[in-house]
Curated annotation (Swiss-Prot):
Domain DAC: residue ranges: 3-141
Function: Participates in a DNA-damage check-point. DisA forms globular foci that rapidly scan along the chromosomes searching for lesions. Also has diadenylate cyclase activity, catalyzing the condensation of 2 ATP molecules into cyclic di-AMP (c-di-AMP). c-di-AMP likely acts as a signaling molecule that may couple DNA integrity with a cellular process.
InterPro entries registered for this protein in UniProt: DisA, DisA/LigA_HHH, DisA_sf, DNA_integrity_DisA_N_sf, DNA_integrity_scan_DisA_link, DNA_integrity_scan_DisA_N, DNA_integrity_scanning_protein, RuvA_2-like
Name assigned to this protein: DNA integrity scanning protein DisA
Catalytic activity: 2 ATP = 3',3'-c-di-AMP + 2 diphosphate
Molecular function (Gene Ontology), one example: diadenylate cyclase activity
Pfam families: DAC, DisA-linker, HHH_2
Entry annotated with the keyword Zinc-finger: no
Binding of ATP, residues: 70, 88, 101-105
Cofactor or coenzyme needed: Mg(2+)
Amino acid sequence: MTRPTLRETVARLAPGTGLRDGLERILRGRTGALIVLGNDENVEAICDGGFALDVRYAPTRLRELAKMDGAVVLSTDGSRIVRANVQLVPDPSIATDESGTRHRSAERAAIQTGYPVISVSHSMNIVTVYVGGERHVVADSATILSRANQAIATLERYKIRLDEVSRQLSRAEIEDFVTLRDVLTVVQRLELVRRIGQVIDNDVVELGTDGRQLRLQLDELLGGNDNARELIVRDYHASPEPLSEAQMTATLDELDALSDTELLDFTALAKVFGYPTTTEAQDSAVSPRGYRALAGIPRLQFAHADLLVRSFGTLQNVLAASASDLQSIDGIGAMWARHVREGLSQLAESTITDSLS
């Protein structure tokens, strides 16, 4: 059976959920609690004492049962309270960095059973959730919103800079004057935007119903970013042939694996794209295959763009092709040939106009 992830568990504890309501009642009562979010033979094996309930979950019931010293065990889907006033006896040999008895039991139980375990501290008035070997302190909405709004402001600045360098790259593509440095600058900015977007997305998940407006802002700022990453990888990877889906995914995974420090190093980015890692190589000329430019043509399907790229090889060859040349490609009819030809002409014209404005 697949065990819940930290992200899934945090979403279950977000404002607006029944579990969060119960936890807030416990915090207001300052009684503390230990709650296991799942039940099977592994959980039963570490439970001692207490009593079976098997009643429907309700925040008020959780609050009342938490007044006892023992742990509360919920069903795996969280819909029922299975046991209460239970003493958890996990394997003491499981390593833990926690100092408090309740927190040590919670971390060990989470590791041993595979189910999330929540510890509510009555002295510090905080909620900590343990999932496997991970630990997460549940913050209040005001704290998360303040942090997320600062991150949104940073994301907006990153997005403005990304748009600038993307326009510069598009202009260089039309003029056939692209250097590897131009490409890596855009790649770096795309990845920075993606990473800060992930941080904000985690905050949105934790905010639950309180994060709806933030979700709208995030979706607007990140719209098209993942697609832009895929297109630039397809356009500029050093592979002699257009990338397969597996190769593109592997390249994106390599980008994901770069540390924040490596992301600022163009030689590390160049290595991911299959180029030499020397500083001199960054000023060398490179030619786009044309995926980015063709993606700017309305209603042109990726399959058609891929056909054109595989037939002509580079964007400059596609730009130089006439409508009849385009139509000669198997799978590109007269209508699409005219549409592509007109679209590329308009794209080149608008790019040059933008550079002059």
